[in-house]
Amino acid sequence: MNGEADCPTDLEMAAPKGQDRWSQEDMLTLLECMKNNLPSNDSSKFKTTESHMDWEKVAFKDFSGDMCKLKWVEISNEVRKFRTLTELILDAQEHVKNPYKGKKLKKHPDFPKKPLTPYFRFFMEKRAKYAKLHPEMSNLDLTKILSKKYKELPEKKKMKYIQDFQREKQEFERNLARFREDHPDLIQNAKKSDIPEKPKTPQQLWYTHEKKVYLKVRPDATTKEVKDSLGKQWSQLSDKKRLKWIHKALEQRKEYEEIMRDYIQKHPELNISEEGITKSTLTKAERQLKDKFDGRPTKPPPNSYSLYCAELMANMKDVPSTERMVLCSQQWKLLSQKEKDAYHKKCDQKKKDYEVELLRFLESLPEEEQQRVLGEEKMLNINKKQTTSPASKKPSQEGGKGGSEKPKRPVSAMFIFSEEKRRQLQEERPELSESELTRLLARMWNDLSEKKKAKYKAREAALKAQSERKPGGEREDRGKLPESPKRAEEIWQQSVIGDYLARFKNDRVKALKAMEMTWNNMEKKEKLMWIKKAAEDQKRYERELSEMRAPPAATNSSKKMKFQGEPKKPPMNGYQKFSQELLSNGELNHLPLKERMVEIGSRWQRISQSQKEHYKKLAEEQQRQYKVHLDLWVKSLSPQDRAAYKEYISNKRKNMTKLRGPNPKSSRTTLQSKSESEEDDDEEDDDDDDEEEEEDDENGDSSEDGGDSSESSSEDESEDGDENEDDDDDEDDDEDDDEDEDNESEGSSSSSSSSGDSSDSDSN
């Protein structure tokens, strides 16, 4: 290991400190000769290599080997020696060329001596006297005493030392200016780079200002004293005062960017990225403070559950933080669906208000700041994302990832076992941490008999087989097990835990023990209700598990395509027009989807026949306008887009036929349209459009004449509703597809009720 000798050798002690015969050129020649005589694989510490050096081979001109060795010792004392001799010589060459570069400039014999500070003048004057008075004291103790004495000096006596310091300081500055004139080459070497100084942070600007103020009052204060005095003041500043320095820092940042861009144009060889120039000097907290004072609105909770928790936690300051989320979750589960929907509506309203306020805030900002805020808020796709409560979350990434999505690894038998038993163990042994709980579950799994393990392995095999069957584009999160069934005691505990925690002052362990005792002392009649609920939960679990094992139902795999400029499809009949009107005006937004469709059906039954005819005429008029607009739009398409549109319509018909079953009337229409297209190729596009409209008309007629059949009214209405919502709200296609399926199944009750009504009216 390379290392510096602990003590100098006799040769080093005897080395002369100045040899006038050696010029800079001679010293560089000496180092070059030494370099040429070094071994090729020099990896020893420098002293070892130096001891094996043949100095007679290094000798040159009139300089003998011994003279070269002495000069080398003198030079090597000026450089760091924790290296090999090869590295040392390179450093020595640099030192010979620039002996006073950087911090070594002050070692130059002509460099003026810096004046002593007022305190050091006092210290040097009194030290000898105090050392005689207290010979037993160490230098450190003497320094402490003299420092204290200096602080206790009256200002009049201190002024004597300060004036002497200022007088010598002026003289030093004059001598320094003279030194710079006499040695311009040294000053050039010591000069710092001309790259513009980086901008300071708000705290640095404040500290520099406060330091100047502090030194005016106490010019003799040390750097440590200044830091100690100002250290904690920044964090105690009011927001208003801190904003002042934030604005100054931003102004300085802007000036720096302009200067730096000019500098880069003059020095293109510098590799400085734009990111390095525009890097912010504000912390996240400072940026948020500035935005808040500029009028940026506070972001609302992402969903109804978070909103509920935020409101509940405001009144739970006395509850330990570890218990708050548990209580919130339990209280949320006890809410009725109507109460949850109210929170959902409230959350949606807060989001809408927030978006309006944020857009107003963005308008007041310059373009660069707008981009920053948009990036932070992730608002570039804000209209495509709808946050829902935990109870109504749906996978929104089914079609987005496509074939590039990495398949999810099926859960193992041990994982299935752990998920079933974890909740029970958490309640029985709440003192265990998550890691301890996992280790305990692993031991329990190992202790299970093979017969019991076989049950979980069968579930694992079923999940694995299902994962392999699933096509790549339609992967769902089916690997997750349904929520484990709860025991009767668990369901009862969830309903009463709030009361018990309040009784035992949020001591969960005591509350659980008390609940356990109460449950054990309860009569069977009292437990019966909870036992029934547990049985229902068990059935639910088995049903969901069997659904998960079953192969996925065949669905329409064709992705809904969007064509730019395509006219919006209007309602097919009076009932759909009536439904669209009620859904778009927001009158039924407070109801869940199923209840909305039921309410629409009942309202349709209650309106008069003349009103129904009015809606029917409106739908027919919109259909006529739609045909004209669609015809013009199709003719305006390029040949490639037209072909793609035709293919999409054709596939859509095929899929709808598969879902609805055979329809002789539509099949005759299709055959007829095919024969027409074969006879006249020039009118192929128009025929296709007419064919589509004929089919739409037939569907509309059948839904009106037949009384809004379950398939036509619910399916077409939901499809049209989705297309309108898609254009208005710009939602994801996956959400539209999900809603289509919901409406198809859920609209049957309303449509069937309306069918009776319309058929009655026709008969009348």
Curated annotation (Swiss-Prot):
Region: Disordered, residue numbers: 1-21, 370-411, 456-488, 546-576, 648-764
Keywords: Acetylation, Activator, DNA-binding, Nucleus, Phosphoprotein, Repeat, Transcription, Transcription regulation
Record Gene3D superfamilies: High mobility group box domain (1.10.30.10)
Composition bias type Basic and acidic residues, residue spans: 370-379, 457-488
Modified residue annotations for Phosphothreonine: 201
Keyword Phosphoprotein among record annotations: yes
GO terms (BP aspect): cellular response to leukemia inhibitory factor; positive regulation of transcription by RNA polymerase I; transcription by RNA polymerase I; transcription elongation by RNA polymerase I; transcription initiation at RNA polymerase I promoter
DNA-binding region(s), chain positions: 112-180, 196-264, 298-362, 407-475, 482-549, 568-634
Subcellular location: Nucleus, Nucleolus
Sequence positions bearing Phosphoserine: 273, 336, 364, 389, 412, 433, 435, 484, 495, 546, 584, 638
Comp. bias regions, Acidic residues: 677-745
Source species, domain of life: Eukaryota
GO-annotated cellular components: fibrillar center; nucleolus; nucleus
Biased amino acid composition, Low complexity: 746-758
Modified residues (N-acetylmethionine): 1
Post-translational modifications reported in the UniProt record: Phosphorylated and activated by PIK3CA.
Biased composition annotated in UniProt, kind: Polar residues: 664-674
GO molecular function, one term: RNA polymerase I cis-regulatory region sequence-specific DNA binding
Database matches in Pfam families: HMG_box, HMG_box_2, HMG_box_5
Subunit structure: Homodimer. Part of Pol I pre-initiation complex (PIC), in which Pol I core assembles with RRN3 and promoter-bound UTBF and SL1/TIF-IB complex. Interacts with TOP2A in the context of Pol I complex. Interacts with TBP. Interacts with TAF1A. Interacts with PHF6. Interacts with CEBPA (isoform 1 and isoform 4). Interacts with DDX11. Interacts with NOP53. Interacts with RASL11A. Interacts with DHX33. Binds to IRS1 and PIK3CA. Interacts with ALKBH2.
The protein's role, per its UniProt record: Recognizes the ribosomal RNA gene promoter and activates transcription mediated by RNA polymerase I through cooperative interactions with the transcription factor SL1/TIF-IB complex. It binds specifically to the upstream control element.
Name of the protein described by the UniProt record: Nucleolar transcription factor 1
Organism of provenance: Rattus norvegicus (Rat)
Gene this chain is encoded by: Ubtf
